[in-house]
């Protein structure tokens, strides 16, 4: 309501907690590491089970075909920002629209759910706040959860199941099962499709950064180094 202070605004509740930066939880004991991951899983499932229309968010985004629209968006960004020809990216641009996962339901998706975007209690491992909602919209909750799980691919320690077990972190199969049971959806059949889409999306994001480096508009001085790896992701 612009009339309150003359412009758009929002209210944010203060939370007294911690933001942890190491997804491998190397500075935590096994109990805390497991508790943090369990609470992240619980919080994401609770978000995805919210019915948007019951809280006045039925117009928060376009319903349906979320992954298809995202594939189109990131394909365009990749092409517009292309700095080299990558055959595997070209193949994905052609293949993904023909092999989209089935969207079982529409819910509120965060868009960038990760350990660094949640706040943990000061004296316990529970998620007390979810941060950074600028990518949130209506979409496919399963795609949102799969994007969150890319950490198990991108982080070498989390990709090591023995490391996870020794550290108290659920391995990827256990973590997916925990979530699936909460939302009552079997993710195993289309998990690889979601992973292909999300890795493509991440490659598109990184290519966009490389495009800004090419055009001289990148904000970060190390942008080119940070955005390397498009070919490996594809």
Which role does the model predict for each range below?
Residues 31-33, 133-137, 166:
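Glycine-rich "substrate-gating" loop/helix at the edge of Rossmann-like oxidoreductase active sites
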Residues 108-110, 115:
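Catalytic-loop of the protein kinase fold
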Residues 143-183, 197-216:
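Active-site activation/catalytic loop segments of kinase-like enzymes and analogous catalytic loops
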Residues 119-148, 154:
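Catalytic activation segment of kinase domains across protein kinase-like and atypical kinase folds
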């Amino acid at each position: 309501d612009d009339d309150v202070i003359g412009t758009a605004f929002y209210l944010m509740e203060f939370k007294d907690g911690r933001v942890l930066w190491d997804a491998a939880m190397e500075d935590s004991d096994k109990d805390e590491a497991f508790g943090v991951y369990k609470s992240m899983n619980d919080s994401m499932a609770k978000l995805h089970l919210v019915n948007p229309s019951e809280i006045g968010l039925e117009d928060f985004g376009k319903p349906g075909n979320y992954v298809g629209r995202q594939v189109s968006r990131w394909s365009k960004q990749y092409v517009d920002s292309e700095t080299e020809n990558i055959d595997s990216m070209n193949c994905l641009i052609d293949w993904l629209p023909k092999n989209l996962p089935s969207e079982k339901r529409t819910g509120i998706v965060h868009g960038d759910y990760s350990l660094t975007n949640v706040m943990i209690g000061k004296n316990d491992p529970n998620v007390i706040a979810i941060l950074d909602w600028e990518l949130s919209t209506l979409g496919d909750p399963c795609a949102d959860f799969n994007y969150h799980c890319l950490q198990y691919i991108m982080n070498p320690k989390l990709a090591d199941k023995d490391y996870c077990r020794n550290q108290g972190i659920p391995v990827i199969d256990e973590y997916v099962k925990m979530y699936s049971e909460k939302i009552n959806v079997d993710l195993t059949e289309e998990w690889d499709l979601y992973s292909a889409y999300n890795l493509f999306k991440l490659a598109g994001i990184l290519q966009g950064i490389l495009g800004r480096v090419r055009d001289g508009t990148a904000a970060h001085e190390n942008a080119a180094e940070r955005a390397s790896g498009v070919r490996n992701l594809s």
